Protein backbone atom coordinates (compact mmCIF):
# COMPACT_ATOMS: atom_id res chain seq x y z
CA UNK A 1 0.00 0.00 0.00
CA UNK A 2 1.20 3.44 -0.86
CA UNK A 3 -1.53 5.28 1.03
CA UNK A 4 -0.16 4.94 4.55
CA UNK A 5 1.91 7.83 5.91
CA UNK A 6 5.50 6.62 5.44
CA UNK A 7 4.86 5.07 2.02
CA UNK A 8 2.71 7.95 0.75
CA UNK A 9 5.16 10.67 1.75
CA UNK A 10 8.16 8.73 0.45
CA UNK A 11 6.48 8.28 -2.92
CA UNK A 12 5.61 11.99 -3.04
CA UNK A 13 9.28 12.80 -2.49
CA UNK A 14 10.41 10.37 -5.18
CA UNK A 15 7.79 11.20 -7.83
CA UNK A 16 7.19 14.92 -7.24
CA UNK A 17 10.33 16.13 -5.50
CA UNK A 18 8.07 17.57 -2.81
CA UNK A 19 6.32 16.23 0.26
CA UNK A 20 3.02 17.89 1.12
CA UNK A 21 2.35 17.62 4.84
CA UNK A 22 -1.16 18.40 6.04
CA UNK A 23 -0.68 19.71 9.56
CA UNK A 24 2.25 17.61 10.62
CA UNK A 25 1.74 17.26 14.35
CA UNK A 26 -0.56 14.24 14.02
CA UNK A 27 0.99 11.05 15.41
CA UNK A 28 0.85 7.73 13.61
CA UNK A 29 2.00 4.31 14.87
CA UNK A 30 4.20 2.46 12.41
CA UNK A 31 5.20 -1.11 11.77
CA UNK A 32 7.17 -2.54 8.86
CA UNK A 33 5.36 -5.12 6.72
CA UNK A 34 8.10 -7.67 7.45
CA UNK A 35 7.53 -7.18 11.18
CA UNK A 36 3.75 -7.54 10.98
CA UNK A 37 4.29 -10.79 9.07
CA UNK A 38 6.70 -11.87 11.81
CA UNK A 39 4.03 -11.06 14.43
CA UNK A 40 1.70 -13.59 12.80
CA UNK A 41 4.46 -16.18 12.62
CA UNK A 42 5.38 -15.49 16.25
CA UNK A 43 1.85 -16.34 17.39
CA UNK A 44 1.63 -19.41 15.17
CA UNK A 45 4.88 -20.65 16.70
CA UNK A 46 3.86 -19.64 20.24
CA UNK A 47 0.19 -20.68 20.62
CA UNK A 48 0.38 -20.29 24.41
CA UNK A 49 -0.01 -16.53 23.87
CA UNK A 50 -3.64 -15.68 23.29
CA UNK A 51 -5.67 -12.51 23.34
CA UNK A 52 -5.59 -9.18 21.60
CA UNK A 53 -2.31 -7.39 20.96
CA UNK A 54 -1.33 -4.03 19.52
CA UNK A 55 1.45 -4.12 16.93
CA UNK A 56 3.02 -0.73 16.30
CA UNK A 57 6.38 0.40 17.55
CA UNK A 58 7.21 3.90 16.39
CA UNK A 59 4.64 6.55 17.25
CA UNK A 60 5.95 9.39 15.09
CA UNK A 61 4.44 12.68 13.91
CA UNK A 62 3.74 13.15 10.21
CA UNK A 63 6.15 16.10 10.25
CA UNK A 64 8.94 13.96 11.72
CA UNK A 65 8.31 11.28 9.10
CA UNK A 66 8.66 13.92 6.37
CA UNK A 67 12.00 15.04 7.85
CA UNK A 68 13.22 11.43 7.98
CA UNK A 69 12.37 11.07 4.28
CA UNK A 70 14.06 14.37 3.41
CA UNK A 71 17.25 13.01 5.00
CA UNK A 72 17.25 10.16 2.48
CA UNK A 73 15.61 11.69 -0.62
CA UNK A 74 16.40 15.07 -2.19
CA UNK A 75 13.04 16.75 -1.66
CA UNK A 76 11.37 19.82 -0.24
CA UNK A 77 8.68 19.78 2.43
CA UNK A 78 5.57 21.94 2.10
CA UNK A 79 3.44 22.21 5.23
CA UNK A 80 -0.22 23.08 4.74
CA UNK A 81 -2.87 23.69 7.37
CA UNK A 82 -5.14 20.81 8.24
CA UNK A 83 -8.44 20.63 10.05
CA UNK A 84 -7.77 16.97 10.88
CA UNK A 85 -5.99 16.79 14.24
CA UNK A 86 -6.47 13.03 14.67
CA UNK A 87 -3.52 11.25 16.23
CA UNK A 88 -3.13 7.56 16.89
CA UNK A 89 -0.69 6.09 19.38
CA UNK A 90 -0.18 2.40 20.01
CA UNK A 91 1.43 0.75 23.01
CA UNK A 92 2.78 -2.70 22.16
CA UNK A 93 4.30 -3.59 25.54
CA UNK A 94 1.97 -6.60 25.84
CA UNK A 95 3.26 -7.93 22.50
CA UNK A 96 6.89 -7.32 23.48
CA UNK A 97 6.27 -9.24 26.73
CA UNK A 98 5.62 -12.39 24.64
CA UNK A 99 9.20 -12.25 23.37
CA UNK A 100 8.49 -10.65 20.01
CA UNK A 101 11.01 -8.06 18.87
CA UNK A 102 10.61 -5.93 15.74
CA UNK A 103 13.56 -6.02 13.36
CA UNK A 104 12.86 -3.01 11.14
CA UNK A 105 12.08 0.65 11.62
CA UNK A 106 10.58 3.52 9.63
CA UNK A 107 13.99 4.49 8.24
CA UNK A 108 14.38 0.95 6.85
CA UNK A 109 11.02 1.27 5.09
CA UNK A 110 11.96 4.63 3.58
CA UNK A 111 15.24 3.23 2.29
CA UNK A 112 13.55 0.12 0.86
CA UNK A 113 10.86 2.14 -0.94
CA UNK A 114 13.53 4.47 -2.32
CA UNK A 115 15.66 1.57 -3.56
CA UNK A 116 12.70 -0.28 -5.10
CA UNK A 117 11.48 2.86 -6.85
CA UNK A 118 14.92 3.81 -8.18
CA UNK A 119 15.52 0.27 -9.47
CA UNK A 120 12.14 0.21 -11.24
CA UNK A 121 10.68 -2.56 -9.07
CA UNK A 122 8.12 -0.17 -7.54
CA UNK A 123 5.97 2.18 -9.58
CA UNK A 124 3.36 4.70 -8.47
CA UNK A 125 0.19 2.94 -9.62
CA UNK A 126 -3.39 3.68 -8.52
CA UNK A 127 -3.81 0.03 -7.51
CA UNK A 128 -1.50 0.68 -4.55
CA UNK A 129 -3.92 3.28 -3.10
CA UNK A 130 -7.11 1.91 -1.53
CA UNK A 131 -9.42 4.83 -2.38
CA UNK A 132 -8.15 5.15 -5.96
CA UNK A 133 -8.53 1.40 -6.47
CA UNK A 134 -12.04 1.40 -4.99
CA UNK A 135 -13.10 4.33 -7.16
CA UNK A 136 -11.68 2.67 -10.28
CA UNK A 137 -13.72 -0.45 -9.52
CA UNK A 138 -16.82 1.63 -8.73
CA UNK A 139 -16.75 0.68 -5.04
CA UNK A 140 -16.28 4.26 -3.84
CA UNK A 141 -16.76 7.75 -5.27
CA UNK A 142 -14.07 10.32 -4.38
CA UNK A 143 -16.24 13.23 -5.57
Give names to the regions the model predicted:
Residues 9:
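Anionic-ligand binding region
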Residues 13-17, 21-143:
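C-terminal substrate-binding subdomain of Rossmann-fold SDR/epimerase-dehydratase oxidoreductases
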Amino acid sequence: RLDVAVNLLTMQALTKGKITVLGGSQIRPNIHMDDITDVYLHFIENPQHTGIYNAGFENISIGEIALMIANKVDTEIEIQESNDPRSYRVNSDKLLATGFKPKKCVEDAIEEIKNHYESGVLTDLDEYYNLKWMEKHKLYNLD
